[in-house]
């Protein structure tokens, strides 16, 4: 196993103090902690996001759209796994009903897009797969693990008056304008399950030490992210707040009482 290096990302909407076990760089509002993608699995990026207030309403292009726009080879589909939520905290994913592009653009300009979105109340353990093109936003008081395609192409549609660039033309072009499919919402109930099944990556969860069968992974490397607890991987500890590159995890000795996220590209 190899632990991935971390990068602390300063954001205007970040928190003044990171939760345990993260150290907090002084005099910075940290919004994200990134794990540097390893060369062996550079298709995937794992990060923590800590939202102190509502974040921008945004969407991401898919692979074909990103390539057509000259923005690289990858679009961005992602999965959010909620790690902490204050009482009543919400995230927005998808619209209440089908709308047209003109309505979306006007709503983004006047801020009413916030009311057109469905705000889902969340709890730790909830998971939302967010395909490219899905209009989404994170509410205040939410922390989560994001597993995503390794791309940072974001089109902001509305940002609550913050002095950051918006991308209305591109955002409207790539956005899906209907409700979010409920089948893409999941929850880590039980000891094992599949949160995302392609097309770009698969994301499993598994409780180490349980009677549940280990996930059926394809041969090769995987990213292992402890959601809770600490796991020993071939004698080396991996804890909450860390992400490890594990070669052939189905053949590794995983010992401990930990709930793990396990990600692999398709």
Q: What residues fall within each predicted segment?
A:
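Transition-metal
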Residues: 1-99, 160-181, 203, 263
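His/acidic/aromatic-lined binding-pocket segments of jelly-roll/cupin-type domains
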Residues: 46-48, 55, 72, 78-81, ...
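Ligand-binding loop in jelly-roll beta-barrel domains
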Residues: 50-54, 64, 74-75, 85-88, ...
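Intrinsically disordered, low-complexity linker/loop segments enriched in Gly/Pro
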Residues: 84-124, 129
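Double-stranded beta-helix
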Residues: 97-115, 145-185, 264-266
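Short acidic-glycine-tyrosine-enriched beta hairpin
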Residues: 117-129, 232-252
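C-terminal amphipathic alpha-helical segment
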Residues: 155-221
């Amino acid at each position: 196993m190899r632990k991935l290096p971390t990068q602390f990302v300063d954001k205007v909407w970040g928190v003044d103090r990171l939760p345990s076990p993260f150290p907090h760089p002084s005099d910075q509002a940290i919004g994200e902690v990134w794990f540097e993608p390893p060369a062996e699995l550079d298709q995937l990026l794992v990060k923590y996001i800590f939202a102190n207030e509502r974040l921008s309403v945004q969407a991401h292009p898919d692979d074909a759209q990103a390539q057509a726009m000259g923005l690289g080879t990858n679009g961005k589909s992602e999965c959010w796994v909620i790690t902490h939520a204050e009482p009543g905290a919400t995230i927005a994913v998808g619209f209440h009903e089908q709308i047209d592009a003109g309505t979306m653009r006007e709503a983004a300009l006047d801020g009413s897009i916030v009311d057109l979105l469905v705000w889902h109340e969340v709890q730790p353990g909830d998971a939302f797969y967010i395909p490219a093109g899905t209009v989404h936003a994170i509410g205040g008081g939410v922390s989560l693990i994001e597993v995503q395609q390794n791309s940072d192409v974001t089109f902001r549609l509305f940002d609550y008056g913050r002095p950051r660039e918006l991308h209305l033309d591109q955002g409207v072009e790539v956005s899906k304008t209907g409700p979010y499919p409920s089948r893409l919402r999941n929850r880590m109930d039980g000891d094992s399950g599949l949160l995302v099944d392609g097309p770009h990556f698969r994301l499993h969860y598994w409780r180490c030490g349980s009677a549940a069968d280990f996930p059926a992974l394809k041969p090769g490397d995987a990213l292992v992210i402890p959601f809770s607890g600490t796991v020993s991987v071939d004698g080396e500890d991996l804890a909450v707040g860390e992400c490890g590159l594990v070669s052939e995890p189905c053949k590794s000795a995983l010992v401990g009482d930990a709930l793990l996220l396990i990600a692999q590209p398709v």
